[in-house]
Amino acid sequence: MRTPLMICALMASFSSFANCLSITENKEITGQFNHDKALCFSTHLQSQRYAELDVKGIQNLQLANQDGTHIRRLLKDVPVDGQQQKIRFLLPETANYQFIAQGEVGVQWHITLKTYPYQPLDKDAGIELTSPRLQMLAQDLTASNIQLFWQQIQQEGTPLVEPYDNHNKRVTFLWQGAQSNVYLLGSPAGDHDPLTRLANSDIWYRSYIVPNDTLMQYKLAPDVPVIENATAAQQRRAILTTAQADPFNLHPSPSKADDRYNYFSLLSLDYPRECQLPDILDRAMNGNTSISRFHSEILNNDREIALYLPAQKMTTPRLLVLFDGQIYRQQYGIDRFFDKLIEEGKLPPIAILFVDSIDSDRRSVELPPNPDFHRFLADELLVWLEQEKGLQVAAKETIVSGSSYGGLASAWVAFNRPDRFGKVLSMSGSYWWAPENEAPEWLISQYQQADKKPLQFFLEAGLFESREGTGGILNNNRQLKQVLQQRGYPVQSLEMASGHDYISWCEALYIGTKALTND
């Protein structure tokens, strides 16, 4: 399960390569993977530039230095039939680099490299200093005091947490030493918030007042570059070029990966949690998870399906169908988590069907209301589960669940196939969505207008998923709850002091499943 094992295996597979393929800027090279399923490209790159790769047909890709030492994972487990990927990243220094690639035998690969002058955005939020500890430091901002401050922070960990009142804490996110900007990805404001520099020091900060039970993942992005000729959306995504785990945070989430760009940092204020990562990832299971490759005639594609079966006998067969299954299972260990909960008697025995979303392009087509997708689930996948796995579950004991677009999809699938899916566990559902030329909150309107169906609901949304006015996922979910209650549906809900992230959804999965199986 640990990613570094994959990295080591990849590196070892290249030890027999005497030479890498040379890659030059602005020139596409292409070829096919042979029986080794791996290859490398070499190039000389300059610092103070950011790189852009366009790749297709490559499943895994790492940036390494000349001797093969890993620097950054750029792609992981991309489907070989997926769309072209565009990747941006900064170069640590002027040097010779390798791109180490992995793919399937016979698959055609394409790769193009471009680099651009690196100019970081000039963005200082200029916000008021409200942290008492930083205010005290600002009164005597000497080099020795700044050095002592960072030494203390390294020992204590970040973010800086200070008292505020009986129900809230003041939390200050910190960064040391950026040139022109630092952004917070996953902020309590639900946006990419810029930090402020403390005078002329190397201290960047941003403070928030948050509830005492706050749970959230975040990254920090120093010196985000200006993207040439970019749209507003493209420039916004530039934060991913440098976004990384907080170097002073002591709690990697879900676990520490092979490089700082590929995991989050955790803020979990004092509050009892069931989803304790990364401990869950190393737990031995009593139950069993089997992996299958499933072809859909309706969707004309293939995907991974994983089925978890508990060790305990299900006197009443129960099933949780979970979208974005690979992420939930591989990165967050939901099968191990539920195995633990079942063993401890906190959940009844329940099977889990993890449905992979293949890639982001197909996810954005399949999960927003799509008639073919609910047909695939009801008429192909559940039939396969019954015929091939011998598991038949009544609709009233079948929960369909997902997060973001997956939350939207769960409510849509149940709306159309209540004969198969009787319960909805929606987390941060994207109920703002509407088909082209339709009003926002389209699915909410469908529930408002249609006859009542035999369904039960559990809706979760984060308090940090709001926007000014009436927008935002939090408000959309509140609107759906109100409509469902007016129509007479059984509805339970949860509003966590959290954002749009998997660590909060891990907790919500337990709470929601417990609520929907507590008959």
Predicted regions: what they are:
Residues 48, 94-96, 213-217:
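Extracellular Ig-like/FN3 beta-sandwich strand-entry sites
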Residues 33-72, 82, 92-93, 104:
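Acidic, Ser/Thr/Pro-rich low-complexity intrinsically disordered segments
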Residues 41-42, 84-90, 204-209:
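Exposed aromatic-hydrophobic patches
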Residues 75-82, 194-200:
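Short beta-strand segments within Ig-like beta-sandwich modules, predominantly Fibronectin type-III
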Residues 13-16:
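N-terminal signal peptide c-region/cleavage motif recognized by signal peptidases
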Residues 18-38:
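Non-catalytic extracellular/lumenal accessory regions of secreted precursors
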